[in-house]
Every structure is written in C-alpha cells, then in structure tokens.
Amino acid sequence: MASIIKRKNSYCVVYRYTDEKGESHQRWESFPTNAEARKRKNQIEYEQDNNVFTVPEARTVRELLVDYMEIYGVNKWAMSTYDAKNSLINNYINPIIGDIPLSDLNPRMMEKFYLDLLKVKSKVINNRKPEHEYLTPSRIREVHKLLRNAFNQAVKWEFMTRNPVEHATIPKEKPKKRAMWDLPTFKKALELCDDDDLSLALNLAFSCTLRMGEMLGITLDCIDVSEEKIENGTAFIFIEKELQRVKRDVFEKLNKRDVIFVFPRCLSGGNTVLVLKEPKTETSKRRVYLPKTVAKMVLQRIKDIQEIKELLGDEYHDYNLLFSSSTGRPMEGQIITRALKKLIRDNNLPDVCFHSLRHSSITYKLKWSGGDIKAVQGDSGHARADMVTEQYSHILDEDRVANARRVDEQVYNQCPSKHNLTVITV
C-alpha cells in the first residue's frame, strides 16, 4: 500500500518495498500535483499486487536535494534561509556531485569534494559581487552543514544506510576578525554626519543593538517616547518585525510564511517583493530601552513625519514607518548603506559595514555592564546566551592593558620578595 502526504506545494507518495536481500525500505517520491501523485500511487499498488514492482533505481544527490527542499526546507526555513540554501545547492553542489548516486557516496569522496571546492570560483548571487574570488572555508562549512542535514534526512527516509559526511574533515577555517569602530571613532562619525536618516540609524543601531532589517521595520505603534517615559528613562521601542526584500518564487513557495505585510510594487514586473515579516527567532522579539538622547531624536522624527503627512495629505503613502522616504515609501537598506559609505569616504573613517555597529554595541555593553551577558542578550535578541559569549567575549585592548596593570598592583607589588611567601593549605 502507498499513501499520499500533502507538503505545502507538493504531494509525496510514501510506500515501502523489499529489496533483493529481503530488507524492507521506506521511500518518498515528490510530485507537484495531486493528480500526478495519485497516478504514481495507483501504479505502485498495481505493480505490488501483481508482483511486478521494480526496485527503484539508486537516487542521486540531485534527486535527494529536491525532496529535501520540498519536504524539509519548505517546512523548516525562513524565506532568506531557503533562498540561501537553494543558491548553495544550485551553484556549488549539483554542478559537481548532483548526478552521483547516493549509494556511491563515501567519506573519502566527500572530503575530496570539500577540498575541490576551494578551487571553485565564487558566483555572483543577487547581483552582488562576491568578496572572495574562490570559495572560502567558511562557505564550504555552510555546504557541509547543508549536506550533513540532508544526508541525515536521507538516512531517516531510508534512502541511505549511513551519512557519508558525518565525520568528514573540512578545510580549516581561520577566525575572521570583525572590523568595527571603537567608541571615539563612532562619536566622531556622529559629529561628522549631516544626513538625518543616517544619523538616526547610527544612533539607533548602536544604542539598541539592532539589525538593519529590524531598524527599518520599526513602526510608530511600536514606539513609546512620551515626555513622561523620556524623563524617567523608560522610553522604549518594541522589535516585532523586520523589513526584507525576498524573491517572489521563494515567497510563493513558502506560502508567504511569517509575512505580516506586503508592500505594493512601485513598478510592474520584477522578481522580488518587499515585505514586513516576523523576525528570525522568537527571542528577536524584544523591548529595547532608549537612552534619553536617542529617545528625543525618535520623538523629533515622529513630529517631522506628522508635519510631512499634513503637508502632502493623500499623496503621502502612510505605512506607519519610522524610516521612510519623503512620500512615506519604505526605506531599504541600500539607502542607509550608501550614506554610510559616503560618510566613511568623505571623512577618511575606518571602513566598516552597517552591521558592525551591532557588534560595537554588544562589545561596549558587555564592557560597561561588567559582563552582564543576560542583559546584553536581552538587547541583542540572540537566541542563546552562549551566542553572545562565543562571538563577542573579546576584550578591548584598553581593558587588557588595565588587567595587566591590576595583576601587577595586586600581586607583585604586594610581594616584595619572592623568597618571603606564605603557603596556604586547603
């Protein structure tokens, strides 16, 4: 007997068969329509009833990944994650090992595949020029994580008896030092910035530890900057959504998952849509308290928006956004990025990306709070505290110098002679 299971935009025929060794296996076959799935189900049942069922040919990596994306990816991933995984498969996996039968895979072959990827040129994705000419160990690690999970699913579905990359060795990745501004540089950038949008973005990103999409997705109903709140230091913003541009096919494939609002297109055509969506994790939904200075900036921005609304009337596209164009349309990340690059170029500032302000924020909040990881995690929205400690527990040079000085003062200056020691027994 076979059964049909509906999976989002596909239909899976699930059945069991016995191989030539007499061992029973389960198999999933994916089809785009219910009619095709029913046709295949009837064929399987007819052949099994008449003892003419042919044992399925060995599946290839490409066929497995189709099922993996349809059954696992569609149900588990956010739109940006689905798109990123799909790019890895189409650009770096299928062209090289896509046609290899699963039964032929072994750990040695997969380790050689990972080494060969170091010689593969990086692809241009979404019109973005890659940072490196060839694939880096960090990108190969992403490929490995995807394949490890896909092969685990294959074992679960009984397509494979073992995972060939479970213990595979991958190219060693050198830790990459994050480029970020120290506090004096950040303060200098604020003084030099004469772009109102960028100035507010810099202040919010640093003081509230925000991701770009979270900041651009802030709506006025998620802000409390009343005079009373500002005065007693409890003004806040509530992060519950983010602005993101996603591919239309992924948007439809995932059935608009996590999407709160779809912005109307300015121009006809196009293969992307701009949306407000749920943040990446539940812990990303959070209340972040504003410093008084920043709260006053936000309050002034709200007043400016109200004046523009009254001036333009019906010509203003009111989406209730804190960051918007002069006509109310959403402000996308590239506008802030271009303004930041101009500020850096015009004033010979250290070259950093906008996301680095989040790293700077976390670093200094850890420093100022004496390492209060939970408090910093509350602002950053990281899912686990260890994500903060692993990525941001580095100490600024000035603190390291101070630590050495403290050791000198507390230990060696109080021990005038190394021969005059007291032994403490515990």
Where are these regions (language model features)?
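Basic, Lys/Arg- and aromatic-enriched nucleic-acid-binding interface segment
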Residues: 126, 133-137, 141, 156, ...
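C-terminal catalytic core of tyrosine-transesterase DNA break-rejoin enzymes
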Residues: 156, 203, 207, 214, ...
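Short, polar N-cap/turn motifs at the start of nucleic acid-interacting alpha helices
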Residues: 222-231, 350-351, 370-393, 420
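Catalytic-site neighborhood detector that most strongly recognizes the C-terminal catalytic loop/helix
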Residues: 172, 180, 231-234, 241-245, ...
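N-terminal core-binding DNA-recognition domain of tyrosine site-specific recombinases/integrases
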Residues: 2-3, 17, 70-157, 175, ...
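Active-site/catalytic core of tyrosine-dependent DNA strand-transfer enzymes
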Residues: 17, 265-275, 279-349
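N-terminal DNA-binding module of tyrosine recombinases/phage integrases
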Residues: 7-112, 303-317, 397
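C-terminal secondary-structure termini that scaffold catalytic or DNA-interacting sites
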Residues: 222-236, 241-282, 294, 405-426
